[in-house]
């Protein structure tokens, strides 16, 4: 008889958001492993649909979308229909965290966060109500944070006997927006440690920050080559340009975390152009995302504004198409004493492109997991601010070598380690999760 798995994730297909990818892919590949999968999820914030995830969801037979009370979504929809979005100017110091001053701004931010908490509470109540309709038992409930409510609903499923085992997963670290909520956070974390049969997170850094290092296990994000269109359907590139592609966010919505800083790569490219390794007419800095002005500001500061090719916010399919056309894929992150766990899902999406990946990592610590993964897989190089001049010189040398290969029409990707890369395919990650479930069943027998 097939194992039964219950997945609780606010973010899920067909939502067009990065948080929906992980649970959707795990559900898809657990289904292919023979699991009967039931999913409880929310409706998302903006109603936009990801056609790729929508296709994945067709393999699932029981996805229950809960329409929680969400005044923020309604407000967003009203604003969107009332007027086109205004383009915001870049911050004066793009390397500093964006700050909103003034009492009215602080009150507005507090009201927004307060409503988010009540929206989360609404999802929890709807999820528990839906759980009461299900026939058990499920062999396992897998809940993936954020928000808070997913684990609270999963705790109810475990406590009520609806699910025999509970795996509590984290794609982000748990944090509270207000100091007065910190006692609740401590109780929440105690509940997880006491009742979850297994704690998993997308990185070892997150496990460490949440004090799960001794008991938790890393289940990283990954990639799915089925997301890519067939190569034969894509026209071959004919232009003679060196395309550096950045997809996604630049600003960070975390306290005490600066904007993602890609200027080290831009400076390395400008230095290469000054050394006649390529002309600025041959260079394209390609961006897709909703922070075009900041991307342009970074490029202008490095003398590369004329090289920018801005696509704005695009669908995931369009983003993947731009990545396929890249010569180099660029990303950025941070590694701080209080923020060690950043192994972004964009890294693994980039991995399936067979293109060199360059990451610029800000922060006061060296030796990030991002740097380790890029080194172990041979997929590229991570330049860390904390490593100082050594990493900057290595980045310049690596960029120059890529340009020499490009000018000589040689393959740019020459150091890739296939086996190391394949461990991040969602097929492998679902098999790893299946193995843990079977291990927990043996321990519980």
Identify what each model region corresponds to.
Residues 1-72, 198, 268, 272, ...:
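N-terminal subdomain of nucleotide-sugar transferases
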Residues 18, 254-260, 317-321, 329-348, ...:
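Nucleotide-sugar-dependent
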Residues 25, 118, 122-132, 149-152, ...:
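Membrane-proximal helix-turn-helix segments that form the acceptor-binding/catalytic region
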Residues 41-125:
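A conserved catalytic-core segment of Leloir-type glycosyltransferases
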Residues 51-52, 72-77, 180, 223-241, ...:
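Acidic anion/phosphate-binding donor-loop and adjacent secondary structure
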Residues 202-205, 222:
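Carbohydrate-associated surface elements
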Residues 224-225, 236-300, 310, 314-316:
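Conserved catalytic-core segment of nucleotide-activated headgroup transferases in glycan assembly
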Residues 385-396, 403-439:
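A charged, aromatic-enriched C-terminal amphipathic alpha-helix characteristic of glycosyltransferases
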């Amino acid at each position: 008889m097939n194992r039964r798995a219950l997945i609780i994730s606010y973010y899920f297909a067909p939502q067009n958001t990065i948080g929906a990818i992980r649970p959707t892919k795990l559900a898809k590949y657990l289904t292919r492993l023979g699991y009967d999968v039931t999913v409880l999820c929310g409706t998302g914030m903006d109603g936009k649909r990801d056609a790729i995830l929508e296709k994945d969801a067709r393999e699932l037979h029981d996805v229950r979308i809960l329409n929680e009370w969400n005044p923020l979504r309604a407000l967003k929809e009203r604003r969107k229909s009332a007027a086109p979005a205004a383009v915001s100017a870049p911050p004066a110091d793009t390397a500093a965290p964006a700050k909103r001053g003034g009492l009215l701004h602080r009150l507005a931010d507090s009201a927004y966060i307060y409503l988010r908490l009540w929206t989360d509470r609404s999802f929890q109540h709807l999820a528990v109500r839906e759980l009461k309709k299900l026939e058990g038992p499920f062999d396992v409930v897998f809940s993936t944070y954020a928000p808070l409510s997913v684990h609270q609903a999963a705790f109810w499923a475990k406590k009520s006997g609806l699910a025999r085992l509970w795996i509590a997963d984290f794609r982000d670290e748990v944090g509270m927006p207000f100091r007065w909520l910190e006692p609740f956070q401590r109780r929440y974390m105690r509940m997880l440690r006491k009742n979850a049969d297994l704690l998993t997170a997308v990185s070892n850094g997150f496990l460490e920050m949440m004090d799960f290092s001794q008991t938790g296990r890393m289940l990283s994000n990954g990639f799915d080559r089925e997301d890519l269109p067939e190569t034969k359907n894509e026209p071959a590139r004919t232009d003679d340009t060196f395309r550096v592609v950045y997809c996604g966010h630049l600003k960070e919505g975390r306290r005490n975390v600066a904007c993602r800083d890609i200027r080290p790569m831009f400076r390395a490219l400008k230095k290469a152009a000054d050394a006649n390794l390529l002309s600025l007419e041959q260079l394209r800095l390609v961006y897709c995302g909703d922070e075009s002005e900041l991307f342009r500001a970074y490029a202008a500061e490095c003398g590369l504004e004329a090289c920018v090719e801005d696509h704005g916010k695009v669908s995931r399919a369009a983003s993947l198409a731009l990545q396929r056309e890249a010569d180099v894929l660029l990303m950025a992150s941070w590694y701080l004493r209080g923020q060690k766990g950043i192994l972004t899902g964009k890294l693994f999406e980039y991995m399936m492109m067979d293109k060199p990946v360059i990451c610029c990592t800000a922060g006061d610590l060296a030796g990030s997991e991002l740097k380790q993964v890029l080194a172990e897989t041979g997929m590229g190089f991570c330049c860390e601010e904390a490593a100082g001049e050594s990493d900057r010189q290595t980045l310049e040398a690596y960029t120059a070598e890529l340009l020499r290969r490009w000018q000589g029409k040689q393959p740019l990707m020459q150091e890739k380690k296939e086996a190391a890369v394949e461990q991040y395919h969602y097929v492998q990650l679902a098999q790893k999760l299946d193995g843990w479930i079977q291990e927990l069943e043996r321990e519980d027998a």
